[in-house]
Amino acid sequence: MLTKFETKSNRVKGLSFHPRRPWILASLHSGVIQMWDYRMGTLLDRFDEHDGPVRGVHFHATQPLFVSGGDDYKIKVWNYKTHRCLFTLHGHLDYIRTVQFHHEYPWIVSASDDQTIRIWNWQSRTCVAVLTGHNHYVMCASFHPKEDLVVSASLDQTVRVWDIGALRKKTVSPADDILRLTQMNTDLFGGVDAVVKYVLEGHDRGVNWASFHPTLPLIVSGADDRQVKLWRMNDTKAWEVDTLRGHMNNVSCVMFHAKQDIIVSNSEDKSIRVWDATKRTGIQTFRREHDRFWILAAHPEMNLLAAGHDNGMIVFKLERERPAFSVSGDTVFYVKDRFLRFFEYSTQKEVQLAPIRRPGSVSLNQSPRTLSYSPTENAVLICSDVDGGSYELYIVPKDSAGRTDYLQEAKKGAGGSAVFVARNRFAVLEKSSNQVLVKNLKNEIVKKSPLPIAMDAIYYAGTGNLLCKAEDRVTIFDLQQRLILGELQAPAVKYVVWSSDMESIALLSKHAVVIANKKLVHRCTLHETIRVKSGAWDENGVFIYTTLNHIKYCLPNGDSGIIKTLDVPIYITRAIGNNIFCLDRDGKNKLITVDASEYIFKLALLRKRYDHVMSMIKNSQLCGQAVISYLQQKGFPEVALHFVKDEKTRFNLALESGNIQIAVASAKEIDDKDHWYRLGIEALRQGNVGIVEYAYQRTKNFERLAFLYLITGYMDKVGFMCKIAGQNNNLMGQFHNALYLGDAMKRVEILENAGQLPLAYITAATHGLTEIADRLAAELGENIPSLPEGKTRSLLIPPAPLTASGDWPLLRVMRGIFEGGLDATGKAELEEDDEAAGADWGDEDLDMVDASEAMANGGDGFDAEEGEANEEDGEEGGWDLEDLELPPEAETPKNAGNALSVVFVAPPPGMPVSQIWTQKSSLAGEHAAAGNFDTAMRLLSRQLGIKNFAPLKPLFLDLHMGSHSYLRALATAPIIPVAVEKGWSESASPNVRGPPALVFTFSQMEDRLKAAYKATTEGKFPEALRQFLNILHTIPLIVVDSRREVDEVKELIEIVREYVLGLRMELKRKELRDDVNRQQELAAYFTNCKLQRVHMRLVLGSAMGLCYKQKNFATAEHFARMLLENNPNESQAKRARQVQQQCSGKKDSCELNYDYRNPFVVCGATYVPIYRGQKDVSCPYCGSRFVPSIEGQLCTICELAVVGADASGLLCSPTQLR
């Protein structure tokens, strides 16, 4: 059983599948009817008008209707689109057990505990027939799918078949009086339109269910005698064919499968049983622990069943329907109807190759699961779940195509899965021993390869390689070297899809798609809410995949979307352009044409193929909010502008892309204060003073406008702003403008008019306006304020700008491929916006005299209409522009955009020094000094296998800052960076640049080494370790000049590595308080490190003392002997001789994992010896050795590189590149 959907609810008594939609109705014992989408797993609606349990429910085949019958004796017809009950049919006198629509006529058949079956016309809402004859509860009744028959089951131990042919002949509406008479006769006597054709007796207890076969003259029934009986009928009689026994309690429901020759039954014994209808034997049994089953329903078209039980329902399939297939070149090989077939994509021709052996067992799920094809040998491997997992090998002759009589005896074998790994070799997974068996085409074992971890399945991963699936990961396994080449965390992978060039792989699990490259380096992961079914790579590197109800795409960067909605699931085999080839669940090849323009457009953007993008914009019908938002998210608002008609959206996109002309045009159309305000901010950012002025005028933001005039030097316009503020009675604005102008007389006048006579007097007296001050003093009388004494007087006036500045100069940039020319309309609009802006700024916004007069008259001085009127009148006034006397030939044409005449053409910039430094350099230190940290990291990763860059971050920053100096210029100018070059000379050519001067040198490393030696001698081990690691982290970034120095750098790495390993072991030893043996081992391993002689003497003395205390005399004697060989001082030598004398001839009290006779190195992670001849892996940078299990982890010595990573080696000098 393959469970597709499950619900938890009250007891389910009735079920019905929708014939086309993925919906199912469930009627509950609580009186509620639920409508579920079993594909999405969501509850769509609930209907709860019945009073008491609802036992019967059924969808109409074509109309948006369903019918329900309950214990309230009512039959209700519902419209699920309007979510309401249309009408209720009354007539039954007891519980209603089942209801069903006729597949063709407007009839409903219902069975009831009142011992009758009724047929209703739901269009006229009347009962057209009452079938009487049962003498106990009628448990079910249903129409025959094709003939005019009804079958019913009753607790009177009989199954009855009713002939309703006469009723069908009367379907033409009779006259009203005849209809009324017929209705009365039907209610009283049951009518004669339906008569009993057969009475089937044979059950010993009450019959709970009976149903017709979809096509054959068969009936199946289930009863309280725990038996399922099969009946056959013809035109004259019906008889019992066989009895199926096996249920341990009452059989609740039984029916024929819609597509397979099987019978499905469920029972109160908590089981569902599947029977072979031809052999009449049990095939399979599914049990639940606590839930009795009550009802079954079969989908009329699909291979789906549903069963209702005490605590809900389940929707399930009996067998997998995914066809086994394998794509090879222009052909897909697949299995259908027990035949191996192939389909050519180019000709769309299907050919039958050879029959496939049928499995001997009769159980379910025996169909092929996977198929692998070898094109050179024309061999096919078919795997299935038969006998717990087995494979069959077929060698198909070239001339067997189309022959149905050809039957070859397949070579068989047991195995979880099998795939071809070479031309004439295939691999079989043996799960019991967790090994891969490589076999030849004679099915003989050639090689056995044990797998490093337990695997569930294997897939092809290139010649000689296998992709092995474990529970939570996938790995690529090399069969020859028996090595894992790559690993990726991907739980519960079900299917694997390689791209045609074997460069990319998609791993499909139940609800996720993981994309990786051929080395299993993760690229992206997509999560789906419903099941992922299949997928294929198209020729552009886009992964096309299907879920239960969609065809979707996944771009290389992880962006995804929907291409098409599906009615039924399909399995993609190939995607070419707009064509998707697939197999359906019946094994039929289908071609689906889709619109690939959306993901091709996004892919072109991703790969920066802007010529392709522009062509698609011109020629295709790409539109919609999804494309616009995608372009905006990916940083292409200028492209999105060409799709947008809505002015507000155009305005936002124009601001985002910096297109001020389109923003002005849209702002005029919208004419909203907020939009003008935002336009002003963007124009100010771009330094477009004219647009800022216009935006401030449209929003009547006079304070900002006056300040703009002040900082741009238009002091005459500030004067006009002062006048306008006065006319608006804005005293604060008027006073601010007077301050800007430095007009003391005006300030005194404003303060006097405002009634602030003391302030007016102080202002006049301070600025030497004696006449006005005397007049004000007379008015103030005795209230004259005192002026401060002893201060030097100065004129409070803003600095006078030397020239009035216009728009900021704009650099000419290369015209973007998306700018202009995409369509004639867009180009014309841009030019029109430019002209409109120029006209407005020429007259309306500069004509401040007219504006002030208009405001004095109570009008709006900044209306666009006013400006346009002035323009039409041909007035040149405003800001005295008409006073300029220009020669006739120098006059600017009226339609020329004034912005174009003031564009500053900057000199072409040269190549940045940082680019020169990195252009031909492969030295990571120089790239870091230039600020190209990403390329520096890539170089270190490639050369030394470095993965952890966190320790290098401060060194990168020091290098970059140390190779640059910064020069301050004017207060308004930016700081100028100056590159610091190595060996710079004043006479050198400006076009010749030397390498950067680096702050880290080899001589510094030697000084640091001496300091680390000193800390080691003094026993400051944490400090010494920090200094040694600092050296190890800095070495990849230094640059030396000669080959001799390169050798010295490599020697320094070895020295530091030995000390870091020894110090780490010593610190580890000091942490271990209780494990005395481990302390001795670590001390012994420390003596194996290559140290300076002074340090070696200290290490040997420490190890000797520790072993002597623990009575390991033989080992202590060995250390004493080594100490005497290293020229100890007098006290050390005396102590060593004493130990040697005391330990002579004695043995160790405990065994240590230390054999000084056998040469070894110490693992840098586990601190265990790796003796000569044992396998090990090393760090590509520092050369530390590790046990093989550490491969792929971060080196614990240098803390930078990955153990076992591929690396080209240290590059620290230009001489290595010559």
UniProtKB/Swiss-Prot annotation:
Which PROSITE patterns does the protein's record reference? WD_REPEATS_1, WD_REPEATS_2, WD_REPEATS_REGION
Q: Where is the composition biased (Acidic residues)?
A: 862-888
Instruction: Identify the GO cellular component terms for this protein.
Output: COPI vesicle coat; Golgi membrane
Q: Which UniProt keywords apply?
A: Cytoplasm, Cytoplasmic vesicle, ER-Golgi transport, Golgi apparatus, Membrane, Protein transport, Repeat, Transport, WD repeat
User: Subcellular localization, per the record?
Assistant: Cytoplasm; Golgi apparatus membrane; Cytoplasmic vesicle, COPI-coated vesicle membrane
Q: How does it sit in the membrane?
A: Peripheral membrane protein
SMART domains documented for this protein: WD40
Q: Where are the WD repeats?
A: 7-48, 49-88, 91-132, 133-172, 202-241, 246-285, 288-326, 363-404, 450-489
Q: Name one Pfam family in it.
A: B-prop_COPA_B_2nd
Chain positions covered by the region annotation Disordered? 854-893
Molecular function in Gene Ontology: structural molecule activity
GO aspect biological process, one term: retrograde vesicle-mediated transport, Golgi to endoplasmic reticulum
| Cited function | The coatomer is a cytosolic protein complex that binds to dilysine motifs and reversibly associates with Golgi non-clathrin-coated vesicles, which further mediate biosynthetic protein transport from the ER, via the Golgi up to the trans Golgi network. Coatomer complex is required for budding from Golgi membranes, and is essential for the retrograde Golgi-to-ER transport of dilysine-tagged proteins.
Listed under subunit, the entry gives: Oligomeric complex that consists of at least the alpha, beta, beta', gamma, delta, epsilon and zeta subunits.
Supply the name of the protein: Coatomer subunit alpha-3
Q: Give the organism the record lists.
A: Oryza sativa subsp. japonica (Rice)
